[in-house]
Amino acid sequence: MEQLSDEEIDHGAEEDSDKEDQDLDKMFGAWLGELDKLTQSLDSDKPMEPVKRSPLRQETNMANFSYRFSIYNLNEALNQGETVDLDALMADLCSIEQELSSIGSGNSKRQITETKATQKLPVSRHTLKHGTLKGLSSSSNRIAKPSHASYSLDDVTAQLEQASLSMDEAAQQSVLEDTKPLVTNQHRRTASAGTVSDAEVHSISNSSHSSITSAASSMDSLDIDKVTRPQELDLTHQGQPITEEEQAAKLKAEKIRVALEKIKEAQVKKLVIRVHMSDDSSKTMMVDERQTVRQVLDNLMDKSHCGYSLDWSLVETVSELQMERIFEDHENLVENLLNWTRDSQNKLIFMERIEKYALFKNPQNYLLGKKETAEMADRNKEVLLEECFCGSSVTVPEIEGVLWLKDDGKKSWKKRYFLLRASGIYYVPKGKAKVSRDLVCFLQLDHVNVYYGQDYRNKYKAPTDYCLVLKHPQIQKKSQYIKYLCCDDVRTLHQWVNGIRIAKYGKQLYMNYQEALKRTESAYDWTSLSSSSIKSGSSSSSIPESQSNHSNQSDSGVSDTQPAGHVRSQSIVSSVFSEAWKRGTQLEESSKARMESMNRPYTSLVPPLSPQPKIVTPYTASQPSPPLPPPPPPPPPPPPPPPPPPPPLPSQSAPSAGSAAPMFVKYSTITRLQNASQHSGALFKPPTPPVMQSQSVKPQILVPPNGVVPPPPPPPPPPTPGSAMAQLKPAPCAPSLPQFSAPPPPLKIHQVQHITQVAPPTPPPPPPIPAPLPPQAPPKPLVTIPAPTSTKTVAPVVTQAAPPTPTPPVPPAKKQPAFPASYIPPSPPTPPVPVPPPTLPKQQSFCAKPPPSPLSPVPSVVKQIASQFPPPPTPPAMESQPLKPVPANVAPQSPPAVKAKPKWQPSSIPVPSPDFPPPPPESSLVFPPPPPSPVPAPPPPPPPTASPTPDKSGSPGKKTSKTSSPGGKKPPPTPQRNSSIKSSSGAEHPEPKRPSVDSLVSKFTPPAESGSPSKETLPPPAAPPKPGKLNLSGVNLPGVLQQGCVSAKAPVLSGRGKDSVVEFPSPPSDSDFPPPPPETELPLPPIEIPAVFSGNTSPKVAVVNPQPQQWSKMSVKKAPPPTRPKRNDSTRLTQAEISEQPTMATVVPQVPTSPKSSLSVQPGFLADLNRTLQRKSITRHGSLSSRMSRAEPTATMDDMALPPPPPELLSDQQKAGYGGSHISGYATLRRGPPPAPPKRDQNTKLSRDW
């Protein structure tokens, strides 16, 4: 973190300035000579303009370039600390001014003659000449700048640029107006030479700040309308008449102001720091004293391409004292680093730490003073936080208990009874009672920071390893003023540390948390779009991630199997689709979808929270549910009923649902899920069907009923998310497919086909669903989403259908695969509520929610829907067919609502609902069971997407992509998911967003769903075998949905990134599609964008989905996202993602996808879009995710399990161990060259290699 040597910079500046002084005359002369040549060549009718332009631009650019660096050097030199002498500066400025004016006077004469000669030339030529002059002036500026005072140079540059500009304008004017030209030119020239002109003054003020800008503007001026120019010139002329004295005074005042600003800027302290990453690599960056830790964190997240998460923290490790502290977001980084000693071994580490905001994720564990951890409904958590932080004063938790206090200078510890109060920490002296008058102030918190001690059992013979340290930030060595306390267990440690933080920072902590939440959400909108979307394949992975091992394994297993069969059928479908899309439907629809999705996503975002539970329902409702509206909630469904509108509705409901899901996830997904599953189990089911009908509207209603339930709905979607899962499930899907069958004819040609085929099966599955319902975590299978595998059809279908039939068998497998990946444990638990918790960590709320659902495993949701409306389901399926995917959608939703959740808790996450949509075809099939949903059949436009979207409905396109093409993408997203999960709270948030997108999608997709049912059949067959797994992923997807499904849906879900839903969605879809070029073609137009934005696109995605292979390819393409997963949870990612990847991977690699003609349709456009989005969000996501996943283990520890840094942290070890061997080089100040960044690359690379 050493600062660069100022002397070196100063020398460079001095040399430059000397040369500059000498060269100024030469430069001007040379330029004028050039001008003469130019005019001559212009006279000879050869159009030189085009040729000259590029060189001109290059000149200007070079000038700007050098300008930028010289300014940087000057600032650095000033930075060295010496205060700048204003008088000396002004003297420099004046001397330069004089020099320029003398030079200018000569030049102006020359120029006048030139202008005369040129007057006859056409305007265009003048412009050219004008441009050249400009370039010349800018280059001369460059030189001038360095000369003299650093600031004066700046001003000079600005002046020169302005002058050149004015000269150009004058030249032009001269052409247009014969009489004025001469005068104008003269004036301008003079100005450029050094005389003051109005234009110049302004230019100096602006241009001094950014000569680059002015240069650019001057360049642009060339392109400005020639007619407009003259008028501008006239205005300038009118202004120029001001007397020279006035002008000089103005100019001088302006210069002084600029110089003062620069001086101020130059005196800002800047530090070059080295930040160590959790993967043992490190990054070097410059920070200035005005930057907060939050800003630096945002910077690092961008640079390291890791997914956004609340848990990313900057950790200060004081190796000499073996302690570490997580910097608070509002703190000033430079201030803290300046406390380090010059020879300090301290390190700055960028890593995920769940302890940072665990306080806000589970406030009941920290604010109530209870000894045991407890679950609490999200709403109650919010109320608790508001009571504590939003009142007139902050309520400091009254923590008290026995702690061990270290004796000064000894390695002995004694027990004392300590109490935390707002004013500080107190203790009861030996032999005294706990009476307020006997309390002794241990210390006040104003000037001390709280640190975690590391390995004090060895260092200080502490009774336990749970130590906290209180010291003044400037104490860097051993001191009697450092207080060491030891707790009996990790829970007590975290309670004390967080209590002290609350007492010290108060409301600022809560504000930091909300700010971080906003950033993460907005980032997720983006990433969910690009990376998530891109990673639709990933998304399945992500679900697996949630479930962790199970889902991973099963996923990969399923993926492998399904891919072949599904890939083939999918590729065929995708080809058909791609052709159809190529015909033009794609583009039109995608644009429409995009717009819709954009509008809807936001909508969904808003309602999400409450709707979450409904999300699932909404989907259901969306599909066939219309009839089912029976449930009162359906009222909202009414909107869904209109099949055409449904898509919108879906988006609405979906969005809400999605949003809701996210919320849950964020807060206490597990709790919510559990509650939801329990209450919702029963409640949910009925509502779900109704919801399905109302779908979009109802979703919200659903949520309310369940309150907690919201999370459950998402679970169903998970299946979808696990595109991989879905793929895997395809076989199982077959059974469930029937349900999905409904999927969506909308799917477009290809999807429709799939769905149609599957449709028949659909009916049967529904019954099964009911049976397996509860038991089967398999419900997940419902999610099965194998449909996704199948591409999109299967995923959705599987979701519903699978659960029923395969449910029992599949459940296990499914569970496993389903997104167990990340939360394998949850998977098994899926059925039971417990699962949710496991999932929760990773899967986020969704997972958690599903657990509640567990009562009624995913199947239960689906089953509930199915059982409730088993008969209807079938008919609904038919309806859904007409409606399209909606049914599918619905089904997924409903499972997510509660059932799915339980099983897939992790993946079940409500969000998944949306995921299903991606595999519209399947979802259609699946939804058939929830035929009610079919009703909403979203609008056909989205169908293609819709079908996949069904689940997602809103994000049909996305969904589809998720399932099929998206699937490919999804995989990458999955990593993201992982990261999300890892972040847990952070991730959760994002996920929720996705759900909203999903919701939107689902709205749109429903049509696809209903339509697709029959189509779904095709994929289903393949899926059936893997339904279980797929389902899992599907179910998980919901939870993951946010991750996996979301990925796929991401675009749609982008909702996941709440905002992004709208914004990001559109980009994501692109990225999503691009990944699976072949599929993309089909899905791309519709899905890509629509997916992101709305179900509309979904259809396209759907196309992609159908082809598992595509997914794989996509995955490859999105490999970067995969990388992310790698980071996140290498295992999880690898397993889940890999398995899914095979299926979805295709999607990512566009090239691989190419086979899918569909993608090829818009290869260019989508590819580009995807690429950029991918690059931006995916890479960011990917790396983040991978990183996150790595950290995940820690994060997983839910709450504050974070164990104190391991012994590695010990001073010596720490160096080597913490950051890895490099870390030892962790010095905050960067002494040597910046560390090599290659590792990060891998993230980006992540691609699908693995």
Swiss-Prot record:
Residues 588-597, 1238-1250 have a biased composition (Basic and acidic residues). Keywords: Acetylation, Cell membrane, Cell projection, Cytoplasm, Cytoskeleton, Membrane, Phosphoprotein. It is a peripheral membrane protein. One of its GO terms (cellular component) is filopodium. The modification Phosphothreonine is found at residues 830, 974. GO terms for biological process: axon extension; signal transduction. Residues 202-217, 535-551, 651-662, 791-802, 948-968 have a biased composition (Low complexity). Residues 552-570, 976-986, 1131-1144, 1151-1161 have a biased composition (Polar residues). It is found in: Cell membrane; Cell projection, Lamellipodium; Cell projection, Filopodium; Cytoplasm, Cytoskeleton. Interacts with EVL and VASP and targets them to the leading edge. Interacts (via Ras associating and PH domains) with RAC1. This is Ras-associated and pleckstrin homology domains-containing protein 1. The gene is RAPH1.
